A protein has these predicted regions:
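Membrane-embedded hydrophobic alpha-helical segments
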Residues: 1-36
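Membrane-interfacial loop-to-transmembrane-helix junctions in polytopic alpha-helical membrane proteins
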Residues: 3-6, 75, 79
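Hydrophobic/aromatic-lined pockets within catalytic cores
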Residues: 21, 25, 42, 46, ...
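Amphipathic, membrane-active segments
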Residues: 28-66
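Surface-exposed, interaction-prone regions with an acidic/low-complexity signature
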Residues: 44, 73, 80
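Membrane-interacting alpha-helical segments
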Residues: 50, 54-75, 123-135
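An amphipathic alpha-helical interaction surface
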Residues: 81-149
Length: 149
């Protein structure tokens, strides 16, 4: 057997080996992306400032309309708490809805509190959508996923 006869076999083996390495690297990239995304989410979710804001919404927010909420909280801590918490859940909703993260992984942990927050703010959001139709839409679309897990 001549050396030239082995060339196609060597090339095919090298190509196959390269393809396997690329697949392994892509899996690692996916895993790294997952870790980076979820670590950031949990870091925010577990922070004292976020928890304080979330607890304020769930336990102290009493307004039932967007105009009433704005009248009492615009430019104050209440508005900041509302924007912080709802913005967070809306962004998580975007990740879940675009399937950039697997819902069970996140929602088994944060889903219960997301439901509590959504239940509390839903009347305000409905009212606010008269002016801003897409307001917190990804958060709302995530809520049924939260109930699944």
């Amino acid at each position: 057997m001549r050396l030239m006869d082995l060339t196609p076999l060597v090339s095919a083996t090298a190509f196959l080996f390269s393809a396997i390495l690329v697949i392994i690297q892509l899996r690692n990239v996916r895993r790294d992306r997952f870790v980076a995304i979820t670590a950031g989410i949990f870091q925010v979710w577990q922070s004292a400032d976020f928890m304080k804001a979330q607890l304020w919404i769930v336990n102290e927010l009493s307004e039932r309309s967007w105009s009433e909420f704005q009248e009492h909280h615009r430019g104050k801590d209440g508005e900041m708490a509302f924007m912080r918490v709802t913005g967070f859940y809306n962004r998580v909703g975007t990740l879940v809805n675009l399937e950039l993260v697997e819902p069970p992984v996140l929602l088994r942990t944060i889903g219960v509190t997301a439901i509590d927050v959504w239940t509390k703010i839903a009347p305000l959001v409905t009212d606010a959508r008269r002016e801003h139709p897409a307001f917190l839409r990804d958060f709302e679309r995530m809520v049924p996923h939260c109930k699944t897990y």
